[in-house]
Amino acid sequence: MNLPNFIIGGGVATGTSFLSHAIRDHSEIYLPKVMRPECGFFYKSWEYSKGLEYYSNKWFADAGEQKTKGERSSLYLHGDFLRVAERIHKHIPNIKLIFCLRNPTERAYANYRFSVLSGYEKFSFEKALSREDKRFAQAKGWKKEIQPNLYRRRGLYDVQLRPFLDFFPKENIHLIKSESLSANTELEIKKLFDFLGVEFQNYNLAQKFTSYSVKSRILQTQLRKFYGEKLTKVTENARQVSYENSIADKIVNWNLLNEKIPMTDSVRSHLNEYYAESNQFVSKITGWDLTDWA
């Protein structure tokens, strides 16, 4: 049975897509082809219940003789309430884990903006934060696990890293500061290749697209109901080219706003204070200078 020996496990809106794209074509590395939604086998109970053989067949059937095999599931880091670390350790105790950690205040806002663009969020950022705990507790169905409106909690890296540090040795966990991945890409890729035990090779750089907002959050939620999972692809096409195959597609294009609406100073101050203790934990275990996170 083909199983991974490394996982890029998150977090959401921290650069994991950029990272996996960068290393995908390395001759000694196998990553499954990009699929939406992401794998999330150890996070989603309805996937995990299908068993390890299903996981192997769906995601690693095409793996060849590469030295190392892996997968990317951005939600794993945030699965402390679902015992994700315990699940992974039960089946692949020697796995190598890679986590990207971004300024949690910026990460929360990026996560919110993605949920808005995906049609999962009708509230302003401030209102969504004020309702987060209630929504988390009352979520039902697939939302009970996926939690598309969980923004603030996902930046508590101390809470989310501790289960992995409890189950896995520190040498099996590689943490990447997202800001360094962006500013010092080659250095961070070299360190990652060393961690994986593969030689340095040229890497891919993902194309960067404009960070879109929407004119109407309510309209975007209605477009989600109309398109379902296809909305993500339709929106991506609209970001890259003039893509209008139907009246609905024209509405998608009309609702996209080619700019990033900034976070308010009051919300930023609230989040910086909220994350202060967690950031100290990250700085302590990594030695990183996190003055740019304050």
Predicted regions and their residues:
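Generic structural signal for small/hydrophobic residues in well-ordered secondary structure
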Residues: G15-T16, G70, I88, L97, ...
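PAPS-dependent sulfotransferase catalytic domain
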Residues: L52-A61, E121-L205
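Short aromatic-enriched loop/helix-cap "lid" or pocket-rim segments at secondary-structure transitions
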Residues: L82, A108-R113, G119-Y120, L187-I189, ...
